[in-house]
Amino acid sequence: MPDIRCIAVVGTGAMGTGIAQIAAQAGLTVWLFDSRAEAAAEARQRLRQTFESLCGKGKLSAADAEAAQNRLRVAERLEQLGDCELVVEAIVERLEAKQELLRRLEAIVAPESILASNTSSLSITAIAAACERPQRVAGFHFFNPVPLMRVVEVVDGLASAPEVGDALLALAARLGHRGVRTKDSPGFIVNHAGRAYGTEALRILGEGVAECAEIDRVLRECAGFRMGPFELLDLTGLDVSHPVMESIYQQYYQEPRYRPHPLTRQLLAAGRLGRKSGQGFYRYVDGQPQDKPGPQPVPQAAIRPPVWLGCENEDDRRTLAELLHRLGVEPETGERPSAAALCLLAAWGEDLSSAVQRFACPAERSVGIDLLCDLERRRCLMLSPLTTPAMRDAAHALLAGDGAGVTVLRDSPGFVVQRVLAMIVNLACDIAQQGIASVEDIDQAVHLGLGYPHGPLEWGDRLGPRRLLSILQRLQTLTGDPRYRPSPWLRRRAQLGISLRAGETAAVG
């Protein structure tokens, strides 16, 4: 492949302009073209202001800012792009439009030049099918804002030559981005892996387990996400998020793991798109949330009962006993709870009603606790339909005794954190099982592209593959929903006691 020194960006919206910025800063000559005659010139002027701003903030020297600006060229006709070694299209997400553009470019650029699409939702194979030389077409999918989101998906279509992807990976490194390589499949890596977070949170909300503000709070404070799922949906806008959910679900022929929720369709129909419309899951004024519910208040408990622990293993018992000790309580040590005891049950992948049966405890005096949470920041409790208000308040007040937050949920298999994290890890395992990308690229793409605290496979190793397998199996049993069926990748590695990042042995030496 030719050394890439000169590129063109076709389509000068936010994405195209961002790609042009990082390319010019990396020393490449960049041609800008847009079907709207003045748009490319306007993009060049915006980039001049961007470079001046970076210079003013000390992030770019005056000489580098001027050099980057001088590398930008405006093309009035596609024919002016003939000397480019790479053309990146960032035009409207319509298959026919992209196919027509690439057909025209094929007749202009050199035979060895690369044609790349920044599509986020269309098939690279389908785009390339309109070309005489589909082997030189690949995906080069950036994320907004391009200069800050330092990951780019390099997508191999069915006909893409391997050296084309190799060249794009090398270019990504020159641009200061982490290139991740993926097969052409719905959602590629990032939009595919991202289906678990929002859809499972919507399911939890739809089941009445908790309100959206409490679900957001739990996932931020207990699991370490930067934003809760409903905050994120409001930020992105349901006019963007819901069609992506629908698209990937349909492209995978109604695979239950990707199933959207009717609630987002209803909000979309009502025009409640999120921040941009002033109302979504929350209400906004000038982009700022209004009347957002605060944490659940700590009750004044009428009783302070003794505490008996129901745990599946000694590690769980030790974790709970140490927590109670810090709160000034020593748990009962008998095999059965005393007549007045609060039964605190560490449930995994099941609802409290099921845990009560398994531990043979009185449901009226039982409360579940999620040990997958960060217990230093927030404790997540669960009630059964029979838990008395007195025991609910006693458990809440006790576990809030050191100032940590407490969230009380209605009965639900897997609380909130267990369900969401198990689905995220399981979906990443399925991506690995399908051979869409390497385990390293899956983790890097999700960590950098979605901002999760860890890559999903690394996260699964931290949580424990066997524990996650058990959670998913119980969720599937209790709900009967095939969306929770464990990926073979996860099941096999849990059974063998190995890392989720362990690859497959080749069938042929």
Where does each model-flagged region fall?
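NAD(P)+-binding Rossmann beta1-loop-alpha1 motif at the extreme N-terminus of oxidoreductases
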Residues: 1-53, 57, 73, 300-330, ...
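NAD(P)-dependent Rossmann-like dehydrogenase/reductase catalytic/cofactor-binding core
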Residues: 2, 177-184, 212-509
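Structural motif
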Residues: 10, 18, 33, 68, ...
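Rossmann-like NAD(P)-binding element
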Residues: 39-42, 53-115, 122, 325, ...
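A short helix-to-beta-strand connector/capping loop
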Residues: 60-73, 135-136, 177, 364, ...
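Rossmann-fold NAD(P)-binding glycine/threonine-rich loop
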Residues: 100-151, 156-170, 341-392
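Conserved anion/nucleotide-ligand pocket segment
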Residues: 189-192, 201-204
